[in-house]
């Protein structure tokens, strides 16, 4: 497989699991929390790399700690970071994910950021 250039988003997934999804106004005690890389562009880049491609990702990040996580994960996954763009005003994107641990149903709020 040849060189692949992926244009797309990078967001930091902030995922929590609980016994059920909260209804408006309800607070639910969660059972677990995970933070990790996500976003359509990043996920496509990972898949292309696993299929044997030489992958670079074009995405925009904020100048924040989540950008460092993005850079580290891209390098760890063997993807080039030479095409990363940075915003001085906007933060790196985030996805707030709440997962029902019994049914696997979820609710997601995306803050696109940079």
Predicted segments, located by residue:
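Glycine-rich phosphate/adenosyl-contacting loop at the front of the ribokinase-like
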Residues: 1-60, 67-69
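Conserved N-terminal subdomain of the carbohydrate kinase-like
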Residues: 26-27, 35, 50-114
């Amino acid at each position: 497989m040849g060189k692949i250039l992926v244009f797309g988003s990078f967001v930091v997934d902030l995922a929590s699991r609980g016994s059920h999804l909260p209804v408006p106004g309800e607070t639910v005690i969660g059972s677990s929390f995970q933070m990790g890389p996500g976003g359509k562009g990043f996920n496509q880049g990972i898949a292309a790399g696993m299929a044997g491609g030489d992958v670079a990702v074009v995405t925009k990040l904020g100048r924040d700690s989540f950008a460092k996580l993005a850079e580290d994960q891209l390098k760890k996954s063997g993807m080039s970071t030479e095409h990363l763009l940075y915003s001085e005003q906007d933060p790196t994107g985030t996805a707030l994910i709440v997962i029902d641990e019994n049914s696997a149903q979820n609710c997601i709020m995306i803050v696109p950021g940079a």
